[in-house]
Amino acid sequence: MAFKLASSPHLSTKAQTRGLMFKVMLCALPGALAQCYFFGWGTLIQIALAIAIAVATEAAVLKLRARPVGKTIRDNSAALTGLLIGVAIPALAPWWIAAIGVIFAILVVKQLYGGLGNNIFNPAMAAYVMLLISFPMQMTTWVAPSGAALHDLGLMQSLSVIFQGADAEQVLAYRAGIDGVTMATPLDAVKTGLSTGLTLDEILTKASFSDGFGIGWALINLAYLAGGLVMLKLKLIRWQISTAILASLFVCASIGYLLSPDTHMGPLLHLFSGATMLAAFFIATDPVTAATSTRGRLIFGSLIGLLVYLIRSFCGYPDAFAFAVLLANLCAPFIDYYVKPRAYGHRASR
C-alpha cells in the first residue's frame, strides 16, 4: 500500500482550515454589518464583489498550476481575503479597485509563493498598500457615514456609482440637488487639521467628531472588537498578538498625548478610529505571516502597535495598519529565529 506524505509541518489537529476560516468570517460579520449601516449599500457591494473575484481568481490560478481546485476553494481562505479587502476599501470606490486589489492579493502575494501557508506577507494588506500607493484618490475618498451625510444612496444609485463610473455628487445633484457625499476619515481629518496649524481640540469640535471619535467609527471598532473577543473565546486565535498591539498602541499614544496634547491624539481615539480593531484581531493574527512562539507573538504585536503610532503621528498615511503589518511580517522570521522555545531536555552550557 502506498502512503502519501504531506508537506510539513506534521501537526495533529481536529480543526480544519475550512471551518476555521468560516468561523473567522462569521466573527467579522458584526463589524462588516456596522460598516454597511454607516456607509450604505456600497460596502456590501464591495464585499460581495471582492469575495467573488477572489474565489474566481484562486480557481483560475489553481487550474493553471494543475492543482485540485474544489478542495482548495472550499478552505474559504480566498473568501476571507476578499472579505478583508472589501471592508478595507472605500464603499463607493470603482469596481476595478476591488478587482485589481483582489487579483494582486491572490495571484501575486499568495499563489506565486506557493499558496496558503507559504506566503510571507498578509495578502489583504499587501493589496491594500498597493492600491493606496497606486490609486491614492480612489482609496482616500470615503462616503460620509450615516449621520454626517446629507444623503442616503440606494442600492441602484450605489451600483451606478461603482460600476458605471457615475460621480456620487452627480447622482445626488440629479436626485435632490444637495452635496456632502464624501468626506475624510477621522484620522485623515486630524492629520490635515494638524498640518494647517489647528490644535487637536479645535479639530475635534467639528461636526464629524460629534461623538468624540468620528461618526460611526467607534461603533464599527466596537463591533470588530466584539467579534475578536468571540474568536478568542472559541480559541480561533491566540491572545498575545491582539493584546500586545492594543497595549503597545495605548502606551505610545498615552505618552505622546501627555507630552503634547495639542498635536497628538489621545489613546482612545487611536484605539477606536480607523481599522484598529479589525487589524488587531482579524489581520495581524494571521498564523501564516505572524510570529509563532508565545514570546515572539508578544514582540510581533508590540512592534505593530509601535509602528502604527509612529506612522500615524509622523508619516503621511494616517491609518497605518497595513504598512505596520507588512513591516512586522518582514520581521517575523527574524523574531522566530531569535525567540525560540527551549527544546525539551535542554541543559544550559557551563
Curated annotation (Swiss-Prot):
InterPro entries assigned: NqrB/RnfD, RnfD_bac
Cofactors required: FMN
Coiled coil regions in record: none
EC number(s) on file: 7.-.-.-
Pfam families in UniProt: NQR2_RnfD_RnfE (PF03116)
Transmembrane stretches, start-end: 36-56, 89-109, 124-144, 212-232, 239-259, 265-285, 298-318, 319-339
Subcellular location: Cell inner membrane
GO CC terms in record: plasma membrane
Family label: Belongs to the NqrB/RnfD family.
Annotated GO biological process: electron transport chain; transmembrane transport
UniProt keyword annotation of Transcription present: no
Residue numbers carrying FMN phosphoryl threonine: T185
The gene coding this protein: rnfD
Function: Part of a membrane-bound complex that couples electron transfer with translocation of ions across the membrane.
Identification of the protein by name: Ion-translocating oxidoreductase complex subunit D
Catalytic class of the enzyme: translocase
Keywords annotated in UniProt: Cell inner membrane, Cell membrane, Electron transport, Flavoprotein, FMN, Membrane, Phosphoprotein, Translocase, Transmembrane, Transmembrane helix, Transport
